Structure formats: C-alpha cells, structure tokens
Amino acid sequence: MRRGWKMALSGGLRCCRRVLSWVPVLVIVLVVLWSYYAYVFELCLVTVLSPAEKVIYLILYHAIFVFFTWTYWKSIFTLPQQPNQKFHLSYTDKERYENEERPEVQKQMLVDMAKKLPVYTRTGSGAVRFCDRCHLIKPDRCHHCSVCAMCVLKMDHHCPWVNNCIGFSNYKFFLQFLAYSVLYCLYIATTVFSYFIKYWRGELPSVRSKFHVLFLLFVACMFFVSLVILFGYHCWLVSRNKTTLEAFCTPVFTSGPEKNGFNLGFIKNIQQVFGDKKKFWLIPIGSSPGDGHSFPMRSMNESQNPLLANEETWEDNEDDNQDYPEGSSSLAVETET
C-alpha cells in the first residue's frame, strides 16, 4: 500500500515538473506576442503617421519576426539526438552486466565493447565513459542530461527558455535563435527610440499608445543586453569548436587532457556547426556535418582519424547498422553521468 502511494506521488511530481518546465517558454511567448501587438498596432498603425514609414517598418519587422519565431520553434521542438544502438549494451549483455558481481568482469565487458567503437575521450581518471543510467558507452562529446533523463549527442546545455536540451541536433537552431533575437531587439529599439523621445518631450499626445511605446523600448533594451552577451559567448565557443560543458571541463583524450582537442581552425570550426554550404547558414534547416557520434579532432593526424582524412564521412549517416572503425581504449572503465 505504501509503495503504491509512493509511486503515485512520484508520478504526480513528474507530471507537475513537466508542466512547470513550460512556464519559461510561456513567459517568452507572452512577451513576444505583446511586443508584436505593441509594435505593429500601437506604434506602426497608431503612432507613426507617414504611410511610407509604416510600410517600411512593417516589412522589415515581419521579415525579422519570421526568422525569429522560426528558429525559436526549431530550438524547442527539435528533439535531442541520442546515441544509436551500437553504443548500447545488448539485452543479453545488459543482463550479464547487471547480474555479474565481479567488478573486474564488468569492466572487461565494457572494455571489449569500447574497442569496437570510435570513442577517444575519457573520464578525468582516464577511464572509458559509461552511463549507468542509459547503459551505454558515451560517444565523444555526449553527456547525460538529468532533466531530459537521456544521453544527448554533443550536449551543450539544457536550456529552460526553450525547455529542451541543446546539442548536436539543434545547436545550430539555438545559435540562430540568439542571433535573430538580438536583431529583433535591436531593430525594435532603434525604430522606437525617436518616438520614445517625442513622447518623453510631450511632442505627441498622451494616449494609450504612449505606455506601449515607452515600455517596448525598455523591454527591447533589457533583452538586447542579456542576449548579446549570451550570443557573444556562444560565438566564442563556435570559433573554438567547444561546447559549454567543454568550456567548463576540459575534455580528456586517450593522450590526456586537451582543451583545444576539437579546434580545427576558425573556418572549419564554423563549418562543424553550420556546414560547408554558406547558403544554409542563415536558414534554420539541418546542415551540421556528421552523425553526432564522431568528430574530427586536432589531437589526431589523418592516419589516426579517418574523419580528417575523408571529409565525406562528415555527411549525415542515419544507418544505425554502420560498422565503426576500431578505436583504442583504456583498460579502466568508470561510470559517468
């Protein structure tokens, strides 16, 4: 009976947590909807008197607004990509692993599996990175998200403002969202400023639109400052080919810690996020090279790392049955979450 109550309580808490996780997104949506009303109706249609100025303001605003909302939508609803079955323990191996009481035998099982996978990063102690929650050997740059309760390929961070994990599948969209958010706030602030001054000096009649125009400038400037800092930080990460997690915790390779292990040079670093076709850089469609399981590394020469020798292997590969080249593995295995 008590166990049933505990399970019901746990289920209720999980449900409440899922509902509450959408609150930050709802706040952003409400602010954006109000900004749309304030700019389009209260500023352009009511306050601005010149027809030509109205048209120009509205066309440019909606062009930015479309890309702003499009990238936000993609950041929210593009699901995080998880490691394929090659990295998971099979049902039989999982049963053997869980039933095995000898730690050294468990370690050997995982070492044998790691030797067949393209994994080159290790834990801080030099052990193979194993997730005991998902029962898989983590691909390079993959981490377990406690909020999403899954391992996420090339995980950057979990963002409450999009209620999603930012990783390999949607990092490009998230970066674009930051860029268009900065542009959105900047455009509003610059076009509203002159009317803000007119209202402040009393050159325009004090009507209902006054509040919306004054507050619109304040909100745009406030969000612009915070967003431009965050966007600048992520631009720096992209230029170094780092994730947020790697910036705070230096990745460890088979040869030891290397903070620039994935740094391929400025242009190639950008291409690792946006792809090599510049026509897709500003559009929120998937163009990041690779499958999220393997990445070219600076610390390995072309003979050691086939991804550097053949850039064609960077292209998306959705075949979970693909045979991976054997990679070296340490003899120690340590679970990491």
UniProtKB/Swiss-Prot annotation:
Q: Which residues form the DHHC domain?
A: 129-179
A GO molecular-function annotation: palmitoyltransferase activity
Would you indicate the residue range of the signal peptide?
none
Residue spans with biased composition (Acidic residues)?
312-323
Bilayer topology: Multi-pass membrane protein
According to its UniProt entry, the protein's GO biological process terms are: peptidyl-L-cysteine S-palmitoylation; positive regulation of dendrite development; protein localization to membrane; protein localization to postsynapse; protein palmitoylation; protein targeting to Golgi apparatus; protein targeting to membrane; regulation of dendritic spine morphogenesis
Q: Where, by residue number, does Zn(2+) 1 bind?
A: 131, 134, 144, 151
Q: Which Pfam families match?
A: DHHC
Any one cellular-component term (Gene Ontology)? endoplasmic reticulum
What is the superkingdom listed in this entry's lineage? Eukaryota
What is the reaction catalyzed? L-cysteinyl-[protein] + hexadecanoyl-CoA = S-hexadecanoyl-L-cysteinyl-[protein] + CoA; L-cysteinyl-[protein] + tetradecanoyl-CoA = S-tetradecanoyl-L-cysteinyl-[protein] + CoA; L-cysteinyl-[protein] + octadecanoyl-CoA = S-octadecanoyl-L-cysteinyl-[protein] + CoA
Q: Which residues lie on this side of the membrane: Lumenal?
A: 42-56, 194-210
According to its UniProt record, in which tissues is this protein expressed?
A: Expressed in placenta, liver, lung, kidney, heart and brain.
Bilayer-crossing regions: 21-41, 57-77, 173-193, 211-234
Its EC number(s): 2.3.1.225, 2.3.1.-
- Reproduce the UniProt comment on modification after translation: Autopalmitoylated (in vitro).
Q: Which family does it belong to?
A: Belongs to the DHHC palmitoyltransferase family.
Q: Which disease relates to this protein according to its record?
A: Intellectual developmental disorder, X-linked 91: A disorder characterized by significantly below average general intellectual functioning associated with impairments in adaptive behavior and manifested during the developmental period.
Domain annotation text? The DHHC domain is required for palmitoyltransferase activity.
Listed name of the protein: Palmitoyltransferase ZDHHC15
